[in-house]
From Swiss-Prot:
The lineage of its organism: Bacteria, Bacillati, Cyanobacteriota, Cyanophyceae, Synechococcales. It comes from Synechococcus sp. (strain CC9311). This is Small ribosomal subunit protein uS13. Located at the top of the head of the 30S subunit, it contacts several helices of the 16S rRNA. In the 70S ribosome it contacts the 23S rRNA (bridge B1a) and protein L5 of the 50S subunit (bridge B1b), connecting the 2 subunits; these bridges are implicated in subunit movement. Contacts the tRNAs in the A and P-sites. It holds the Pfam family Ribosomal_S13. Residues 97-121 are annotated as: Disordered. InterPro entries: Rbsml_uS13_C, Ribosomal_uS13, Ribosomal_uS13-like_H2TH, Ribosomal_uS13_bac-type, Ribosomal_uS13_CS. One of its GO terms (cellular component) is cytosol. It comes from the Bacteria. GO terms for molecular function: rRNA binding; structural constituent of ribosome; tRNA binding. HAMAP family: Ribosomal_uS13. GO terms for biological process: translation. PROSITE patterns: RIBOSOMAL_S13_1 (PS00646), RIBOSOMAL_S13_2 (PS50159).
Length: 121
């Protein structure tokens, strides 16, 4: 099993698809990496040679992926919360950030319903 950027990529998949298992690499970026490394996108991971894997490792080093990317995204959210902007406050309150309605929808973001006692007559 090939290990790139700390991730074991699946052996039986085409390398073009297998690279997308790495956080921060989608299909477009996978094609870019394969072109840069000079590796055939139709080859299976199990058929890769050691020098091909090393070329792929070198090609992925120029991109922000995995832990570094997760850290960057976390810092961006923390920055929004620290400066107190609307987006940061919405993130902190676990509400939709991009202007969606919350009176009836947004169940995923708000969580399960909280039962409120009814009004006595």
């Amino acid at each position: 099993m090939a290990r790139i950027a700390g991730v074991d990529i699946p052996r039986d998949k085409r390398i073009e698809v297998a690279l997308t298992y790495i956080y921060g690499i989608g299909s477009t970026r996978a094609k870019t990496i394969l072109t840069k490394a000079g590796v055939n996108p139709d080859i299976r991971v199990k058929d890769l040679e050691d020098n091909d894997v090393q070329k792929l490792r070198n090609a992925t080093e120029s991109f922000t992926i995995e832990g570094d990317l997760r850290r960057q995204e976390g810092m961006a959210l923390k920055r929004l919360q620290d400066i107190g902007c609307l987006r940061g406050r919405r993130h902190r309150m676990s509400l939709p950030v991009r202007g969606q309605r919350t009176r009836t929808n947004a169940r995923t973001r708000r969580g399960a319903r909280k039962t409120v006692a009814g009004k006595k007559k």
